[in-house]
Amino acid sequence: MFSRLRAVTTPCTLTCRRVHLKEKGKPLMLNPRTNKGMAFTLQERQMLGLQGLLPPKIETQDIQALRFHRNLKKMTSPLEKYIYIMGIQERNEKLFYRILQDDIESLMPIVYTPTVGLACCQYGHIFRRPKGLFISISDRGHVRSIVDNWPENHVKAVVVTDGERILGLGDLGVYGMGIPVGKLCLYTACAGIQPEKCLPVCIDVGTDNMALLKDPFYMGLYQKRDRSQLYDDLMDEFMKAITDRYGRNTLIQFEDFGNHNAFRFLRKYQQKYCTFNDDIQGTAAVALSGLLAAQRVINKPVSEHKILFLGAGEAALGIANLIVLSMVESGLSEEEAQRKIWMFDKSGLLVKGRTASIDSNQEPYAHAAPESIPATFEDAVNKLKPSVIIGVAGAGPLFTHGVIKAMASINERPIIFALSNPTAQAECTAEDAYTLTEGRCLFASGSPFEPVKLQDGRVFTPGQGNNAYIFPGVALAVILCEARHISDTVFLEAAKALTTQLTDAELAQGRLYPSLANIQEVSANIAIKLAEYLYANKMAFRYPEPEDKARYVRERIWRSNYVSLLPDVYDWPESSLTPPQITEEKLPH
C-alpha cells in the first residue's frame, strides 16, 4: 500500500525537511498539519509532551492507511464515504494525502466529482469544520483584513468560486465551497503541491436558489445574488488583496462561476494576474487531448473534423477556442477553423439571425443557417453530419439512441464525448455508446463509467476526460516557474503533453486518456513539459533558470510520508571537542 508517487519521483529534498515546532503536547495532535495519530515515535512522544496522551502502541503510516481502507469498505453511501475521508483531512493531513495518492483512481470520484456535488448540496447539513476563506459582499472595503486572517504566509495557489454554477447543479451559493476544497485536494494528491500553499475561497454575493434562501440551515447570506457594480468591485478588491499579501505570481484559479462572469473575468484578469478558469481552459485542454489521442487511432487530424457541440456555454466555448488554436497551428486560418465547429443549445442550432440571443463569445460559431434549420439535436447530427459530437450541456441524456445510431451510420469511427458532470447529467452512458456503435466509437466521459463488455466478448474501458489530468500539472509548472500570466497556449501545450503519455495498449482498450492510477506521474510530466515551454517562451520569472527542468520539478514535489518533528540532533567529531593536554609548569614563587 505504498504511494505510487514515491515510485515515480526522486527523493523530495526541498519540501520535506524536518518540521521545527514551537508548540508541544496536545496542540500537536489537534493540528492536522502536525498530527501523526498513533505514529508519533517514542522520542517524539517523550520530547514533545505527548507521552501518556496516546496508547503505548507506535504505528506505521501503512497500518493507519490499512485501517482507513478497511473502515471505508464497510460504508455503502458515497456521501458517508466523503464525510469519512474529509474527516481524515481535518485530523491528519499527511495520512489523508497518503491514502488518496495510494488509491487515487477509486477515491477521486468520492473526494471530487461526482460525489462532491452531492456533498455541496448537503453542505449545511454535513458541516464539521470550516475550510478556506469566506468573503461576502458585506465585507467590501475590508477584504484585505480578511485575507490577513488566513494563518499561512506562503500561499501560492488560490481556487475561488462564487457558487453560481456548481457542476451541473446550478446556484448553490456558499455551499459551493466544497468545489475549491476538493480541487485543491487534487492539486496536492495529483501534483504534489504543498497543502499549506493552497487556499480555497468562496465569494458570497447571495444566491438565486430559493430553496436555499428558505433553508434554516443555509450558511450564506440570505439575499438574492447581487449582480451590480458592487460585485465587480468586490472581485477587484479580492484579486488585489490576494496578490498584495502573497505576490503578483500567486496562481488564482476561477471555478464554477456563471457563464457570463467566467468569460468576463478571464478577459479582465488574464493579462493582469496569474489566473485561469478551469471550466473554460482546463476542460478545453482535456477535450483537445482526447481528440489528439483519437487522431492516433483513426489517423485523422483534428483540423479535418467537423465538430458539433451540445451546449454553447463556457465549457463548449472554451473547448472550441482551443480546438481553433490547434487547427490554426496546423495551418488553417482562424475563420476556416471556426467554420468547422457548430453548436446546439437549449434554443436550438447556433446560427446567425436566430430569435434567441447570441452573446459576443458565441458569435464566431454562429454560422449561416442551413436551408432547413434542425429542430432537435438528432436532426442537427443528420443535417450537419459531424465526425465528432461533444456534450457539455449538463442537461442529462440528450445523446439519445437515435443520435448515437446516426453518428454510427455517418462515420466509420464516430467520436462521442459525453463530458457533463455529475454522472446523472451525462449525455449518454458508455454502455450505450459502445453497444449502439458496435464498439466502433471513440468515447470519453466527464464522469467515471465501468468497462463495457459487448456480446462478442470485446471489452472497452471508457476514458474519463477528467480535468484533473490538466490543472494540477499546469498549476505545478506555473508555481515552480513563477509565471505571471497564463496564456491559452499553455493549455494547448498541456493537451499535447497529456496525449503523449497515452500508451498503445491503453488505446487498444478504448482509452483516450492514461489511467488515473498514474495521475501523479502524468502531472509531473506535464509540469516538466510546461516548465520547458514557459522558459523557452520567456514566460517564467524564477531565476536562475534550472538547467535540468525534470530534476527541478521532481525535487519539489511534496510527499505525504511523515517527517520528524524533533530538532536536528547530531554529533560533532570527538577530536574537535578535545582540548590539548595542559602541562604543569613551574609557577613563579
From Swiss-Prot:
The keyword NAD applies. Its cofactor is Mg(2+); Mn(2+). Transmembrane segments: none annotated. This is NAD-dependent malic enzyme, mitochondrial. One of its GO terms (molecular function) is metal ion binding. It is an enzyme of class 1 (oxidoreductase). Its EC number is 1.1.1.38. InterPro entries: Aminoacid_DH-like_N_sf, Malic_enzyme_CS, Malic_N_dom, Malic_N_dom_sf, Malic_NAD-bd, Malic_OxRdtase, NAD(P)-bd_dom_sf. Subject to allosteric activation by fumarate. Its main location: mitochondrion. The lineage of its organism: Eukaryota, Metazoa, Chordata, Craniata, Vertebrata. The modification N6-acetyllysine is found at K156, K224, K240, K272, K346. Fumarate binds at R67, R91. It catalyses: (S)-malate + NAD(+) = pyruvate + CO2 + NADH; oxaloacetate + H(+) = pyruvate + CO2. Divalent metal cations. Prefers magnesium or manganese. NAD-dependent mitochondrial malic enzyme that catalyzes the oxidative decarboxylation of malate to pyruvate. The active site is at Y112 (proton donor), K183 (proton acceptor). NAD(+) binds at R165, N259, A312, E314, A315.
